[in-house]
UniProtKB/Swiss-Prot annotation:
It comes from Duck hepatitis B virus (strain China) (DHBV). This is External core antigen. The keyword Nucleotide-binding does not apply. GO terms for cellular component: extracellular region. The gene is C. It holds the Pfam family Hepatitis_core.
Length: 305
């Protein structure tokens, strides 16, 4: 990092701008360190670890914007903050909420300063090509104290007498781009952790796997709509919603004594239960002959006698 002396010359303000831009690098490396060391330090299930790695491959428009993401994350974290929870996902999501808020403001400030410098850059100055600007992957390998020096050497190699205001503009644009890529990585991690609090880590893991499968399937072989986490986490409720429920309660089998089957027989064309006591036959039944009196048991005298 260069120690520039502030001079009253016409480009003194520009030198002050370069010095200020080097101070902003202290906030640049925070998400880089967090996102690099994050995967190796955090213990998690192997399936969850794979799903988290797949989060980085999801389309950019899948995730909410920074403002919406931070607001949704705060709503999900508020109950845990009130109870002073120390769950893994709560601690990490809280860290990324604070990090993204501060880091996003720093990045927006870099863009605003860079745009304001356009008015004082000579109109004939050619912009620094992208190949001369440090990229995000290179910034991860360069020490913090050497980042500004490496970028300045590249600008000088492009044009030794490059205007000072244009150099400041190139520095800010390079750092802002690195910031945005780091913010995107932190944004995906924040989305993962606060959704694990809302839906459960296993459900989010399952959702990411199904979504990745849907995205990798050719359009003509997959469904029209992408899978949603609501449908995955509530399959039972959805299936039972269309079933008609009976008004009464059904007793489970086996809790009431078995009813004994009653055997029946047919007597004179009528059904009678054997379990009932047999009653004496009535004097006269339908379809039966008249009962004989006791005297009828003796034979009547023969008329021949």
């Amino acid at each position: 990092m260069w120690n520039l002396r502030i001079t009253p010359l016409s480009f003194g303000a520009a030198c002050q701008g370069i010095f200020t831009s080097t101070l902003l690098l202290s906030s640049l490396t925070v998400p880089l360190v967090c996102t690099i060391v994050y995967d190796s330090c955090l213990y998690m299930d192997i399936n969850a670890s794979r799903a988290l790695a797949n989060v980085y491959d999801l389309p950019d428009d899948f995730f909410p914007k920074i403002d919406d993401l931070v607001r949704d994350a705060k709503d999900a974290l508020e109950p845990y903050w009130k109870s002073d929870s120390i769950k893994k996902h709560v601690l990490i999501a809280t860290h990324f909420v604070d990090l993204i808020e501060d880091f996003w403001q720093t990045t927006q400030g870099m863009h605003e300063i860079a745009e304001s410098l356009r008015a004082v850059i000579p109109p004939t100055t050619a912009p620094v090509p992208t190949g001369y600007l440090i990229q995000h992957e290179e910034a991860e390998e360069i020490p913090l104290g050497d980042l500004f020096k490496h970028q300045e050497e590249r600008i000088v190699s492009f044009q030794p007498d490059y205007p000072i205001t244009a150099r400041i503009h190139a520095h800010l644009k390079a750092y802002a781009k690195i910031n945005e890529e780091s913010l995107d990585r932190a944004r995906r991690l924040l989305w993962w952790h606060y959704n694990c609090l809302l839906w459960g880590e296993a459900n989010v893991t399952n959702y990411i796997s199904r979504l990745r499968t849907w995205l990798s399937t050719p359009e003509k072989y997959r469904g029209r709509d992408a899978p949603t986490i609501e449908a995955i986490t509530r399959p039972i409720q959805v299936a039972q919603g269309g079933r008609k429920t009976s008004s009464g309660t059904r007793k489970p089998r086996g809790l009431e004594p078995r009813r004994r089957k009653v055997k029946t027989t047919v007597v004179y064309g009528r059904r009678r239960s054997k379990s009932r006591e047999r009653r004496a036959p009535s004097p006269q039944r339908a379809g039966s002959p008249l009962p004989r009196s006791s005297s009828s048991h003796h034979r009547s005298p023969s008329p021949r006698k």
